[in-house]
Regions:
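C-terminal catalytic domains of large/alpha subunits in multi-subunit enzymes
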Residues: 2, 6-190
Length: 192
């Protein structure tokens, strides 16, 4: 039996979307703030040590459509910075709080781990498409907030592809990877 998923859940909300009518000043490029959607895709290749639970990102590719690119070097740096930020969220950064007081337990750089240059992929390729945006200044679109978002699923799915176990909690710490591998091994051996 086939059924549309949309029909199996009652609606829980409604959304509306409006577009901008102000195209901006053609000489200066100035225009009002507005919402825009940008598109990109990221691919990660990882190596997972199944004895230690460590995840190393070996290669990484990111491609974004940023409208008209004004400064390619700055744009590349912005995307690489977003990859670094997302890599930290995917593999290391974990806010821990005291359950009684609600205060952060790991509130220093000693306890709250961030990626270093040693954690970054050895091979990283950044590219962009250029579809000029009619509303953006000189046809450009923003990129800053969008670059870390695809990093987390790219790394998590690469880990899934590498070990065959889907981990739906972040960060992918060695302890968490080993815990999920152990659970999967127990499930596999009990089914056999």
């Amino acid at each position: 039996r086939q059924m549309c998923i949309r029909d199996s859940f009652p609606p829980i909300g409604k959304a509306t979307f409006g577009t901008l009518s102000d195209a901006g000043d053609p000489e200066t490029g100035h225009c009002r703030n507005f919402e825009k959607h940008i598109f990109g895709t990221h691919i990660a290749e990882v190596e997972v040590d199944t004895e230690l639970g460590t995840v190393d990102v070996l290669r990484y590719v990111a491609v974004h459509d940023c409208g008209q690119v004004i400064n390619p070097m700055l744009l590349t740096g912005q995307i690489e910075g977003g990859i670094s930020m997302g890599l930290g969220q995917a593999l290391f950064e974990d806010m821990k709080e005291d359950p009684e007081t609600g205060r952060l337990i790991n509130n220093s750089f000693t306890d709250y781990l961030l990626p270093t240059s040693m954690d970054m992929p050895l091979e990283m390729k950044v590219d962009f498409l250029q579809t000029p945006d009619e509303d953006g200044p000189f046809g450009a679109l923003g990129i800053g907030e969008a670059t870390p978002c695809p990093v987390l699923p790219a790394i998590a799915n690469a880990v899934y592809n590498a070990i065959g176990v889907q981990i739906r909690e972040l960060p992918l710490t060695p302890q968490r990877v080993l815990e999920y591998l152990h659970k999967a091994c127990l499930l596999y051996t009990s089914d056999a």
